[in-house]
Amino acid sequence: VTRIQTTTAGSLPRTTALIEANAARTFADDGFTLQSTPEFERLVAGAVAEVAERQRRAGVTLVGDGEFGKAMSNPVDYGAWWSYSFQRANGLSLTEVNALNEPPVRSEPANLRLTSFLDRRDRQLFPAVYAEAVELGRVATAFPTTTGPISYRGHDAVASDIRHLKAALLEGEQGFLTAIAPGSAARVRNEYYASDEEHVWAWADALREEYQAISDAGLIVQLDDPSLAENFDQINPEPSVSDYQAFTEVRVAAINHAIRGLPKEQVRLHLCWGSWHGPHATDIELRHILPVVLEANVGSISFEAGNVRHEHEFTVWGEVDLPDDLVLAPGVVSHATNVVEHPDLVSQRIERFADIVGPDRVVASTDCGLGGRVHPDIAWAKLEALGEGARRAATRC
């Protein structure tokens, strides 16, 4: 019987102690860099060891650190995967106008630019829903702006992430750490570089140091890049597919620049449409972006395949030319609903992809991070359903 491997998209529920400890941390003089202490580091190390063991018990075979090194000071937080990067880059400072409150921007054909977060098209289509029902939580720090040259300063922080995860792994066990991709990091407001494209490339050069550190440690680095799909919603008015593909090709080229020379099998790309609980009616279809995404020189791709907006798109993977060595990590349990998936549904979802690439090239995963998006008890029940579904699929593939 083939064993179906399992993993997660990264974020897992933080413990109450970890959330409270993050909330109690002080800021450096810049107003957004969180200070660390030896006591805090010990708390994180212990929490990572526990979350790794809990993943194993649930049936996860490729574990991560739950993103516990990325600060969450509130139980509901959709942004820790991004806001952690502010702690790890030079060239940022707090300004009156930032990515969250900047004025709207209008794009023109062949000249696409991201508009403000408040001007996103799904939000404009459903203003009452976003005003009343879409909870986005709070991130642990304020949003800075690029006001100088971007460079990497996260060496100690990524070394801590690596140390904590490696200490939590069993002998010979592989693990992964997440890191933001250049295109997503560059969505902070740019007041320094001559163009948005230059801004993306600057982040690529800086973040390469983080990817290299994780890879050199023998771990898998997962590049979180919701921007590849999600930017479509942040361009107003809606762009043509060809213009959006050209816009996205720059972001994929920046990924390839940043991961050049790293072992392909140690690089995983996470593609998603944003994990907030909104209508997502303006999400771009997978078939329009997959050919561009497949230009990324990565060993595996993690993506949403377990929610009502994107589950039907599993067929697209069978309609494109996939590299023979590309591993697919489809989301088969989702952050998008409180309903816990039945293991037989999980198994069916896995089997669809096994039919396309073979069971040895499928690693069953979560759609997106679960931490900060669903109640912790639901998150762990979903991971148990993931583990059981993978066991059932193994008997059928």
Predicted features, each with a name:
Residues 1-397:
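Domain-level signal for soluble alpha/beta catalytic cores
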